[in-house]
A protein has these predicted regions:
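AAA+ P-loop ATPase mechanoenzymes
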Residues: 1-63, 72-74, 107-110
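Walker A/P-loop NTP-binding motif of AAA+ ATPase domains
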Residues: 44-198
Length: 198
């Protein structure tokens, strides 16, 4: 009993971080939860972000999405130079709303099949909210590279867009995309009806 209580306490005090390794999800670490009060963003940004996520996770919101036949998911874009707090913001939101984090590392070697496997392999059997993180999306979906034909990506834009549109997302997915420079990204990714908040 004491051991089970210790495990439960550990889970309550930490955020589980999973990492996709080409074919499967592996737990990368458990990081201490970070109080929302320690998150410092530009004026109004923290309140706007937390209100959006809070509203998304409400049962009434889920019911509304499903009543209109819409995929129940939310996509948020965070952008800024390395070291500006994108990862910290995601960890803090995960802490505040008691979510697991599932990180998909974006590389030119990531295939369509691997991306679909990543989304379909997220554990939704537990009564646990989850955040999916697609990091540095601008590193492979760069509009200038696509114009020149230099992207050489195994992951196609069409598959990524299907993931963002919710067709391969688990129900209730809160998805964060990060980018160093949102201005270089393909406009098909950042159009307003695909990104709920940026």
């Amino acid at each position: 009993l004491d051991k089970r209580q210790a495990i439960r306490k550990s889970n309550n005090d930490t955020v589980r971080v999973f990492y996709f390794k080409k074919e499967y999800w592996a737990m990368l670490s458990k990081v201490p939860k970070r109080p929302i009060e320690t998150l410092y963003l530009k004026k109004g940004q923290k309140e706007s972000l937390t209100e959006l996520v809070d509203e998304f996770f409400k049962k009434e919101t889920r019911d509304t999405y499903l009543s209109f036949g819409m995929p129940y998911k939310c996509v948020i874009m965070l952008y800024g130079a390395p070291g500006t707090g994108k990862t910290t913001a995601i960890t803090t939101i995960a802490s505040h709303f008691d979510c697991d984090i599932y990180t998909i590392p974006i590389t030119k070697e990531l295939s369509d099949y691997a991306m679909i496997d990543a989304f379909s392999g997220i554990n939704d059997k537990e009564d646990k909210k989850h955040i999916v993180v697609i990091e540095d999306i601008d590193s492979i979906f760069n509009a200038e590279e696509r114009k020149k034909g230099d992207d050489n990506n195994m992951l196609t834009l069409n598959t990524l867009l299907n993931c963002l549109d919710g067709h391969t997302c688990k129900e209730g997915t809160l998805l964060f995309m990060t980018a160093n420079d949102a201005n270089v990204m393909d406009k098909a990714i950042v159009r307003s009806c695909r990104i709920d908040h940026k």
